[in-house]
C-alpha cells in the first residue's frame, strides 16, 4: 500500500507574535482588596498584605505575598535600601502601568523572606470592597 500525506504549511508567512487575550481576575465581592488606581483592576487581597513599611521609587509601598492581574518584566540586580536584590518590575495586566516590583532573589540572608513577594506603591493603588472608616488597618 502506498499512502500520500499532505503537508500543511503554516498559514502565517511572518513570525509575528500572537496577541494573547488578557483575562481579568476578580477577587471575591465584599472582601477587602487593593486595586489599580488607574483602571480599578483588583491587585491583591488585604489578607495577602505582609507589611506597610516599605519604600518604593515614588514613596510609600506595601509588601504582598500574592497578587492578581499583574505581569512581570525581566529580573535585574538593583541596590535597594536594604541591600542588593534581583527584582523584576511588575505592571497592571489591564492598563500596563508599572506598579512596583517582585523580589526574585535577596543576596543577604536577612532579606530572604522577601523572595517571591511583591511591592506595590501606594501611588498606584486604592482600597476597594468592604473597607469602612472605623476599621482601616
Swiss-Prot record:
Region of interest (Disordered), ranges: 1-20
Top-level taxon: Eukaryota
Family matches, as InterPro entries: Yippee, Yippee/Mis18/Cereblon, Yippee_fam
Name assigned to this protein: Protein yippee-like F37A8.5
UniProt-annotated binding residues for Zn(2+): 36, 39, 92, 95
Start and end residues of each Yippee domain: 32-129
Membrane-spanning parts: none
Keyword Zinc attached: yes
Similarity field: Belongs to the yippee family.
Keyword vocabulary terms for this entry: Metal-binding, Zinc
GO molecular function, one term: metal ion binding
Disulfide bonds: none
Naturally occurring in which organism (per UniProt): Caenorhabditis elegans
Amino acid at each position: 500500500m502506498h499512502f500520500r500525506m499532505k503537508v500543511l504549511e503554516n498559514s502565517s508567512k511572518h513570525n509575528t507574535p500572537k496577541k494573547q487575550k488578557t483575562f481579568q481576575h476578580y477577587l471575591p465581592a465584599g472582601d477587602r482588596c487593593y486595586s489599580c488606581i488607574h483602571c480599578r483592576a483588583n491587585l491583591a487581597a488585604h489578607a495577602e498584605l505582609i507589611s506597610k513599611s516599605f519604600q518604593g521609587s515614588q514613596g510609600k509601598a506595601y509588601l504582598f505575598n500574592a497578587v492578581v492581574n499583574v505581569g512581570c518584566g525581566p529580573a535585574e540586580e538593583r541596590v535597594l535600601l536594604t541591600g542588593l536584590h534581583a527584582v523584576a518590575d511588575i505592571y497592571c495586566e489591564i492598563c500596563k502601568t508599572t506598579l512596583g516590583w517582585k523580589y526574585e532573589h535577596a543576596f543577604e540572608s536577612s532579606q530572604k523572606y522577601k523572595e517571591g513577594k511583591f511591592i506595590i506603591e501606594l501611588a498606584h493603588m486604592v482600597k476597594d470592597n468592604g473597607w469602612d472608616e472605623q476599621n482601616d488597618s
